[in-house]
Amino acid sequence: MKILITGAAGFIGSQLAHRLWKNGDVLVLIDNFSFGHEDNLTFEDHDFRKEVIRMDIRDKDGIKSLMEKGDVDYIYNIAGIAPLPDCQLNPTEAIDVNLNGLVNLLENGRRYGVKKVIQASTNAMYENETEFPTREDDFKVPTLIYPNTKYCAERFAQSYCDTYGMSVTCLRFANVYGPHVDCLRKQPPFVAYMVRELYYGRTPVFHSNGEQRRDYIYVDDLIDLAIAVRESKGFDAVNVSSNTNYSVNEMYQLAEDIMGKHIKAEYADDAHYWERYPELYEGSYPIKKEILNHEINKYSLCDNAYAQKKYGWQPKVSMREGLSRLIEAEVELLKNVKA
């Protein structure tokens, strides 16, 4: 079985590649390294660094060259621009990568007989929901650029299924955590950020009171479902959630306990949440304070009953166990990174 993984040098893509390699699948790995890191490609039992092709998913000739032999069975499209402020700052780039990149894969998949495309989507599309837990069919159109790119990508995926009879499953990830989560980027995911600050002995700054709640999913549990959906036909959209959530304060206290470090966090004004992106606060129409307030303080909890019923999937990794694994891997990485 031959599988193309895009975004293979990223957090999720690299972990997926490692699992499928251990399963004996033949892999074609691509990444343009805009967010991926070579460090993600080394595992105790295998080094993928020389196997990853430096390629953008928008590269029409490049993608065609990988697929025109007709021997790629499945595509996992994990590539994309995910950080919310990056998408707000460069919306045309976000749309081009997250939407046009997928369409490039779908079109080549259509032409060259791919059995299935599994698309990385997001539960950020539920940002305007008010009833929880959120099911796949509970939906209000999102506000921010990133979830809108994923919403539109799902519509194009469904169009290809309805028009050509292709099969695409969109996995709506909750907040994914685990080894290789990117702690080095400009605006790291919360879990990676708090571990990094604790490791360096710095005071973490939370732009809230710490009581907002998010649902999380451990990367290995996500991969279990990504494999389970591979044989389903037609279009599908599936929540990938642990069916529970945690507050910022609960997560931070757990990280303190695991790392044996205790640093009092600072709670700051949510208006400065994206202060590392000053351009968003400039111009005739700066970003609205209420939008930042909503993004920071929103409540998220997705219902995973559909994934359990249709695919027999159940998340297995507890938050303590998963966070411990993440901390172990991140600390090892940070030993070689200047503070």
Model-derived segments and spans:
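Hydrophobic alpha-helix immediately C-terminal to the catalytic Tyr-X-X-X-Lys motif of short-chain
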Residues: 152, 156, 160, 190, ...
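Short-chain dehydrogenase/reductase
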Residues: 95, 143-154, 185-192, 215-216, ...
